[in-house]
Amino acid sequence: MTIGAFVAFPALADPAKGLEIAEQRKAVDMGWGDSVATMEMLLRNKQGESSSRLMRLKSLEVDDDGDKGLTIFDEPRDVKGTAFLNHSHITKSDDQWLYLPALKRVKRISSRNKSGPFMGSEFAYEDLSSFELGKYTFNYIEDAKIEGVDTFVLEQVPTDKNSGYTMQKVWLDQQFYRPVQVEFYDRKGALLKTLSFEDYKQYLNQYWRAHTMSMQNHQTGKSTVLTTTDLAFQTGLKDKDFQKNTLKRAK
């Protein structure tokens, strides 16, 4: 689909099959508990100039609700100590807070600002939420090959009225139900961004994680690449490690 093309829902779209595939995607990724990742964020502008940041992402699986995540920036110096806390929810809007050391205060991200850029990257705050079935309505579109991989193609429409997207087009590999690519369409229905998932590795003999996630903004020419350099599961994290009042002391 070319840039600026508008979303057209195919006549043969199958909502029931779309939901069934999405449910299977969710089911195969349950039970991992918690994880800690070390990551590099590479920001590149339209001219190709780049800058990098080092960060850690702590995640906690939550029964009967969305997952919790804590991102802590370690480098460079101007962002060191910045911490972002995300409490995902299945249906209602996520709770999100950002601690900025220079201001020595915790800022709540309002629902209306979830479509804004996270730390100057091409990822929006809403992109950092965990995948939850209640956040979307689903349509199965077709089977397709992408870079030699057999995939299901789904359209998922956000249920949150404050979402910056009218629709996301998702390619899931048919063997493991892993996302291969996602296209994001803006509020006017035009293609905004494409997210690509690469270098998958399996953990605990079940859970797949992409070690490279590349977000390309087609409207600005900017891109952000998240590369995971280390990842550990079941490290013993608890709910108390994901509280707003601990953001200023996040380590």
Predicted regions and their residues:
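Gly/Pro-enriched, hydrophobic low-complexity segments
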Residues: 74, 85-87, 95-99, 105-109, ...
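N-terminal mature ectodomain segment of secretory-pathway/periplasmic proteins
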Residues: 14-102, 139
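N-terminal signal peptide c-region/cleavage motif recognized by signal peptidases
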Residues: 8-10
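A short, surface-exposed loop/turn module that caps and links secondary-structure elements
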Residues: 142-145
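Sec-dependent N-terminal signal peptides
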Residues: 1-5
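A short, amphipathic edge element
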Residues: 19-20, 51-52, 128-140, 189-194
